[in-house]
Curated annotation (Swiss-Prot):
Binding site for substrate: G105, H106, D269, G274, S275
EC number of the protein: 4.2.1.77
Family: Belongs to the proline racemase family.
Protein name: Trans-L-3-hydroxyproline dehydratase
Superkingdom of source: Eukaryota
Annotated catalytic residues: C104 (proton acceptor)
Keywords: Lyase
Note: In contrast to the T.cruzi proline racemase enzyme, lacks the conserved Cys at position 273 which is replaced by a Thr residue, transforming the racemase activity into dehydratase activity.
Job of this protein: Catalyzes the dehydration of trans-3-hydroxy-L-proline to delta-1-pyrroline-2-carboxylate (Pyr2C).
Catalysed reaction equations from the record: trans-3-hydroxy-L-proline = 1-pyrroline-2-carboxylate + H2O
Native species: Mus musculus (Mouse)
Pfam families assigned to the protein according to its UniProt record, in alphabetical order: Pro_racemase (PF05544)
Amino acid sequence: MEAALAVTRLPPNDPRTPALSVVDMHTGGEPLRIVHAGCPEVAGPTLLAKRRYMRQHLDYIRRRLVFEPRGHRDMYGAILVPSELPDAHLGVLFLHNEGYSSMCGHAVLALGRFALDFGLVPAPPKGAREAQVNIHCPCGLVTAFVECEGGRSCGPVRFHSVPAFVLASDLTVDVPGHGKVLVDIAYGGAFYAFVSAEKLGLDVCSAKTRDLVDAASALTGAVKAQFKINHPESEDLGFLYGSILTDGKDAYSEEATTNICVFADEQVDRSPTGSGVTARIALQYHKGLLQLNQTRAFKSSATGSVFTGCAVREAKCGDFKAVIVEVAGQAHYTGTANLTVEDGDPLRDGFLLK
């Protein structure tokens, strides 16, 4: 009897703030913490307005989810919200150690499974092998396709991106400690700077992670200081999210190409980076290195996990020629939790060590 009571007894929680019920997943090693209950209402008529409201009024929720002691500086989170788009099954706000992203491919791959398994989309017809999940991200509507059996997710997920394009190609950037380097900037729902790690004196496959992070951070800072990022359709999307260092193998090959993404406040993506794969496919297509429906494999130098990507059709974003990119990968569940706040805890909203 006492053992049963011990199991069901909950930790104390400040009654002024509800506990956050979360489901934890990972995609290619990159974590995702999904809040499915307990978050206060996120006000705003549009998803981008909700993102601004979250930043201005509810940022303590992000810190509790992502920061220590409940998380860590490389944790990633997702808040599910209603969408104003009639075709969307759900809206999502993406959270990281510095703030709020416009797109996250690894999260979309995980959310596809979550939405199907937790009943956020209509059950697929009997015998269906794939379910469609329309996810409204801050960058726009992204469609996920979830392998399923008996109405439950059972395998890899793929998604079709928003229009992806190249903002600048072979841009000369003076990177502190590395001199002048030719850099590409491409958009896959978020803007990234791309460069072969070799140009920064590193091997992306064997260098220490700390050295890769330092080089990528120097590149990000230099691009931000020397080049203005503008999105053709929305001011909210006009910012550089991070830098992706590659092995330089951009020409089409059946062999996987390796990269590492460093984004936000030196946060290291453990996966190949879904929005980064999207942008890198757009870049390769722009340079004539890839044709429509040619699939490439992208490997994370952090974990060795692999996503695939291909340009499925041409599109436009403002005046930019763009492509819709299909990205595929495997997400896994890792646990559930109730994140509580005890009254009087001086570290209730979290902290980060660097």
